[in-house]
């Protein structure tokens, strides 16, 4: 008598899974549908490249343990995990309805979004289920950290579940709600990211998810996050320096917003308060008037899933049948290929693959609507140098009024590095470097001028900011804000020749912030 497949434990043998279409991708991972033969069930497998993942295996295992302990109807079920070569495979439940983002894209592509993408009843129904899932996570001492439409999945029965496709978005506190639950890990997607996550000064807690939830509410109505058109550093700058976004932010055709009422707008504004302490909890939001409009899953099944693309429409086909655990590469045309270094070129498979016309490889780059490009989605902790001002003059005394001249060391200067790499190439396309001065105070309260060059097309704002930190010239906590303002200047140097901005590192002791004297502030100028 054959054993009931449902009673079998989930296999940790790679050969028991037949990999199928690619249904999602990020900077360090690919999500594929797969068929588990022993269980006779289709699943989703997230394949994490451990070489790119900067989180230690110990930390990953802790997070997987936290995922395995999540049992809630609004959280995607985790089945098992195992290592295949240099990849960690996470086996999870496959929801055939796809993500809410898939539905949004489908509606927009068909031009059915002129009066708003989803109606209030649909939004309320989806978001109420998301809140139920978030309330469960938060009560169990976990922060999701990447709430957005792309991580909200639908089952064929109209059920709604939060996916954790960021893997380490879960950080367990051992279920002890009394423990310190403040994180300082830079994880998430810029458009949905809370200001306190960007600043990394005081850390953040569960309220970061509430901000992302508010942005997601806007996304479900308008089809996109408020700052989706801007590059990542611009998003960071707008989020930190502007008033919180609203339903109207970034929307050109205001007609599409007319059907959205006061309770919806009020709910969004409650979530998008810059002070996290003023944001409601998930439990408090569930009692908000707007969610009285929510209906049941049969409503979603009938009204929303009928407008959703099928799994075959969503899927990205793989050019070669995956016969091994080779690496996948995204190509210029959006397709997927298995890497050539995973098979024998003299084999029949190798000869066949080489003889085929293949799309050119492209460097990995993730759009702003997906992931922060220079930050691994599996949380990288920003390291603040122990001696922030090691390379700066250190005399004792009161706040200085005249700046000390400091240059970025040649070994760390991005423009010089780029020139060294291209020396002898004879390229005529080299852009003229922009000479800049960053004026700020060191830990001894001395005013310093840090001079450096930025070469458009070669340097990046993030890279230069990191070089300044590595050289001990800038506090590590100011990485984001310095990069954001540098990006602002190099994008429009004619209109932004000088900017003064508040530093995330703040002021020491009894000092009072002063933008004129640059106490707690910095000034970046074109010299």
Swiss-Prot record:
Give the matching SMART domains: S_TKc
Output the Gene3D superfamilies linked to this UniProt entry: Phosphatidylinositol 3-kinase Catalytic Subunit, Chain A, domain 1, Phosphorylase Kinase, domain 1, Transferase(Phosphotransferase) domain 1
Q: How is its activity regulated?
A: Activated following phosphorylation by WNK kinases (WNK1, WNK2, WNK3 or WNK4).
Q: Where in the cell is it found?
A: Cytoplasm
According to its UniProt record, this protein's enzyme class is transferase
Compositional bias (Acidic residues): 334-348
Q: Which residues carry this modification: Phosphothreonine?
A: 185, 310
Q: Which GO terms describe its cellular component?
A: cytoplasm; cytosol; extracellular exosome
Q: What is the effect of changing residue 185 to E/D?
A: Mimics phosphorylation; promoting kinase activity independently of WNK kinases
Among CDD domains, the record links this protein to:
STKc_OSR1_SPAK (cd06610)
Q: Which UniProt keywords apply?
A: Acetylation, ATP-binding, Cytoplasm, Kinase, Magnesium, Metal-binding, Nucleotide-binding, Phosphoprotein, Serine/threonine-protein kinase, Transferase
SUPFAM superfamilies according to UniProt = Protein kinase-like (PK-like) (SSF56112)
Q: Where is the active site?
A: 146 (proton acceptor)
Outcome of altering residue 325 to A? Does not affect activation by WNK kinases
E.C. no: 2.7.11.1
Q: What does this protein do?
A: Effector serine/threonine-protein kinase component of the WNK-SPAK/OSR1 kinase cascade, which is involved in various processes, such as ion transport, response to hypertonic stress and blood pressure. Specifically recognizes and binds proteins with a RFXV motif. Acts downstream of WNK kinases (WNK1, WNK2, WNK3 or WNK4): following activation by WNK kinases, catalyzes phosphorylation of ion cotransporters, such as SLC12A1/NKCC2, SLC12A2/NKCC1, SLC12A3/NCC, SLC12A5/KCC2 or SLC12A6/KCC3, regulating their activity.
Name the protein family: Belongs to the protein kinase superfamily. STE Ser/Thr protein kinase family. STE20 subfamily.
Protein name (Swiss-Prot/TrEMBL): Serine/threonine-protein kinase OSR1
Q: Native species of this protein?
A: Homo sapiens (Human)
Q: Which gene encodes it?
A: OXSR1
């Amino acid at each position: 008598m054959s054993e009931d497949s449902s009673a079998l434990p989930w296999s940790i043998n790679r050969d028991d899974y037949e990999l199928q279409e690619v249904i999602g991708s990020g900077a360090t991972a690919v999500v594929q549908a797969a068929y588990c033969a022993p269980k006779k069930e289709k699943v989703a497998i997230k394949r994490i490249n451990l070489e790119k993942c900067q989180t230690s295996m110990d930390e990953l295992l802790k997070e997987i343990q936290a995922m395995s302990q999540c049992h809630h109807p609004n959280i995607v079920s985790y089945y098992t995990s195992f290592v295949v070569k240099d990849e960690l495979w996470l086996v999870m439940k496959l929801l055939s309805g796809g993500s809410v983002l898939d539905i949004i894209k489908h509606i927009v592509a068909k031009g059915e979004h002129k009066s708003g993408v989803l109606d209030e009843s649909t939004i309320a129904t989806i978001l109420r289920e998301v809140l139920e899932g978030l309330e469960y996570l938060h009560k169990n001492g976990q922060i999701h950290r990447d709430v957005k439409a792309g991580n909200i999945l639908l089952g064929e029965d109209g059920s709604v579940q939060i996916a954790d496709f960021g893997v380490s978005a879960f950080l367990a506190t051992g279920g002890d709600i009394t423990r310190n639950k403040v994180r300082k890990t830079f994880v998430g997607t810029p458009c949905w990211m809370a200001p306190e996550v960007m600043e990394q000064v005081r850390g953040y807690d569960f309220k970061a998810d509430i901000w992302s939830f508010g942005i997601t509410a806007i996304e479900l109505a308008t089809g996109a996050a408020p700052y989706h058109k801007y590059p990542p550093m611009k998003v960071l700058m707008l989020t930190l320096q502007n008033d919180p976004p609203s339903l109207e932010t970034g929307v050109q055709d205001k007609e599409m917003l007319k059907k959205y009422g006061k309770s919806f707008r009020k709910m969004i504004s409650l979530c998008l308060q810059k002070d996290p302490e003023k944001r409601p909890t998930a439990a408090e939001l569930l009692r908000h008037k707007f969610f009285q409009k929510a209906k049941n899953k049969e409503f979603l099944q009938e009204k929303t899933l009928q407008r959703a693309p099928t799994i075959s429409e969503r899927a990205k086909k793989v050019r070669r049948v995956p016969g091994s655990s080779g690496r996948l590469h995204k190509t210029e045309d959006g397709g997927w290929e298995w890497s050539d270094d995973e098979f024998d070129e003299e084999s029949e498979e190798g000869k066949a693959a080489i003889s085929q016309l293949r799309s050119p490889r492209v460097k990995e780059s993730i759009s702003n609507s997906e992931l922060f490009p220079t930050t691994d989605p599996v949380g990288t902790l920003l390291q603040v140098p122990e001696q922030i001002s090691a390379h700066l003059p250190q005399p004792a005394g009161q706040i200085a009024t005249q700046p000390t001249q400091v240059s970025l060391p040649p070994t760390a200067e991005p423009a010089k590095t780029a020139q060294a790499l291209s020396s002898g190439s004879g390229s005529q396309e080299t852009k003229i470097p922009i000479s800049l001065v960053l004026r700020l105070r060191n830990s001894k309260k001395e005013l310093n001028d840090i001079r450096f060059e930025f070469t458009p097309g070669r340097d990046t704002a993030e890279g230069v900011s990191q070089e300044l930190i590595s050289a001990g010239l800038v506090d590590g906590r100011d990485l984001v804000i310095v990069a954001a303002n540098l990006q602002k200047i190099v994008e429009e140097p004619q209109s932004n020749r000088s900017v003064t901005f508040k530093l995330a590192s703040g002021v020491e002791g009894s000092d009072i912030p002063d933008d004129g004297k640059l106490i707690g502030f910095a000034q970046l100028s074109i010299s």
